[in-house]
C-alpha cells in the first residue's frame, strides 16, 4: 500500500510471518556406493581389478542450498612375466555441484517485517512472482513494470532462497601408474617407475 503522496505505507500489517522458519529446513543427506572386484589369472600372469561408482547428495539447512557429488574409480594390478613385472594403475574422477543458496536471505529474514505475507495477489507484486516486497512507484514509462523494489528496505528472504541459484561445479581427474620390474637373475635388483597426474 502507498500513501496519497506515493510513498510506501509503513504501518504494521496483519500477518504473523516467521521469516526464519520460512527459509530453514531439516536437512537430509544420502550416499550410495557400488563396487565390483575380480581378476584374471593365467599361468604366467594375473590381473586383479576393482571398479567403483558413488553418489552423494546433501541438503543444507537453508532452503535451496545443496551439495551433489558423483565419483568413479578403477584400479588394476597386472602381474606379468612370472611376477617379475608388477604394474599398478589407478584412476579416479569426481564431479561436484554446490549451491550455497541465497546467503543474504539469512540477514533479510532477521530484518524483514513479520507483519507482511510471503506472497500476495496484489498487482503491485506481479513482477516479482507474487512475492511481497517493499515497493516504490517506478519513474519509467514502462506499463509492464509499474513498481520498483525499494533497495533501502529488506528483500523478501523466501524469494531469495527459492528463485536464486548460485551453482558452482568442479571436475577432478586423478591418475597414477606405477611399475616395478624385477630383473631376471638379479631378483634383488628392481627398476621402479611412477607417473601421476591431476586435472581439474
Protein language model features and the residues they cover:
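Surface-exposed beta-strand-turn/loop segments characteristic
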Residues: 1-37, 48-52, 56-66, 144-149
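Residues on the lipid-exposed face of transmembrane beta-strands in outer-membrane beta-barrel proteins
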Residues: 34-40, 74-78, 175-181
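Residues that define the transmembrane beta-barrel architecture of outer-membrane proteins
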Residues: 28-32, 66-70, 169-175
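Outer-membrane beta-barrel channels and translocator barrels
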Residues: 29, 40-45, 81-83, 182-186
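Membrane-spanning beta-strand positions in outer-membrane beta-barrel proteins
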Residues: 33, 46-52, 71, 84-90, ...
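Surface-exposed loop/interface segments of Gram-negative outer-membrane beta-barrel transport/assembly proteins
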Residues: 1-15, 43, 61-62, 75-174, ...
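Acidic/polar N-terminal loop/beta-strand segments that form early-domain functional surfaces
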Residues: 52-54, 166, 182-186, 194-196
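Short helix/strand-bridging catalytic loops that position acidic/His residues to coordinate divalent metals
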Residues: 58, 71-73
